[in-house]
């Protein structure tokens, strides 16, 4: 396997929160494990598939060698090959050509490929939400979010969670629901899903991550018009926001939304 040029740490584009975030050495290793665990693959097929995945991690301009390889039709080797073609298109931002193989691979007899294909369909729709909403400077304009893509992403996420309730991407899908809420300005849903994530956090790091996210995007976001006051089905988040609004430095702001007696009465 040719590992020349593979960085031990993710590149800048791998940590900016975009579609490249999953193209890193950790996912490369997980892919290798799937190749090793699949007894139907020959050593030659494993090497070819592994080298292609390395090429994608290097973001190399070299042409893929996979199309010339004679993988048997409907074999697991072909499923892995088609999966790699899909993620190649995905990381290049060619979402229409990424979607085609993943739609077919949902029915694959290779279980890891079938599950991952369904997850990738969710991520394709997620990225399509903001495909035309980010300018050349990286600034996000929520008014240009693709609402149809957002609805499709939620539909595909629900489909994944229904098909794989204990799947390997459950936490990712649930977390990305909050990103969809933010992309579309559905702040009540963001509060609800954020409070749910707080209750499900199993480590201090996970809890801190959700709290920081809610504070930046919702509770402490001064650019929300109108500002977030509360959400009936999210009592903890609502109570936290009331406490913040009761602070003296907030109450004296000309743009402050004053806490009412009715709110305090519950």
Residue positions per predicted region:
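Extracytoplasmic/secretory-pathway proteins
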Residues: 1-103, 113-266
